């Protein structure tokens, strides 16, 4: 089934966001593991795996719509030197992704592609949950301090 050209391009933009997020999250996850923050390492690693699943769905949909998945595109990866900066960088990336998903949902609706819209809506809900979790972590750091927050991240 031949998909709308604008929608296919938007799906490839989303794919670049997801592929970038995978790399950024994996680096942050491994940095946390290296610092002994095992709980945070596992949470961020799980997030990277979820982003891989998002990328897989996008690739499948692009192929179904007779497009070419552009896996050679990555956005700028922002690696934080410490946990608070990592959380801030990840939150910024999630806000960008959330907006892009909502733009893509509107476009899918405009071109009458309900199955793509439905897929995107499900992923947008998961991205919204990512934003919530990151904001919660930042709130905890503000409320209890970075030292206590990090001491709570050493256990799985």
Identify what each model region corresponds to.
Residues 1-156:
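Iron-associated oxidoreductase/ferritin-like identity signal
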């Amino acid at each position: 089934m031949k998909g709308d050209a604008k929608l296919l391009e938007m799906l490839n933009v989303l794919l670049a966001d997801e592929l970038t997020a995978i790399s950024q999250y994996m680096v942050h996850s491994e940095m946390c593991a290296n610092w002994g923050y095992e709980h945070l390492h596992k949470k961020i690693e799980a997030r990277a795996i979820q982003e891989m699943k998002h990328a897989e769905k996008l690739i499948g949909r692009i192929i179904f719509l007779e497009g070419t998945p552009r896996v050679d595109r990555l956005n700028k990866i922002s690696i934080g030197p410490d946990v608070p900066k990592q959380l801030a960088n990840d939150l910024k990336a999630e806000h960008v992704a959330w907006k892009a998903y909502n733009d893509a949902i509107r476009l899918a609706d405009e071109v009458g592609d309900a199955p793509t819209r439905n897929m995107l809506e499900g992923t947008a809900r998961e991205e919204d949950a990512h934003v919530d979790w990151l904001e919660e972590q930042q709130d905890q750091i503000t409320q209890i301090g970075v030292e206590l927050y990090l001491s709570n991240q050493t256990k799985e």
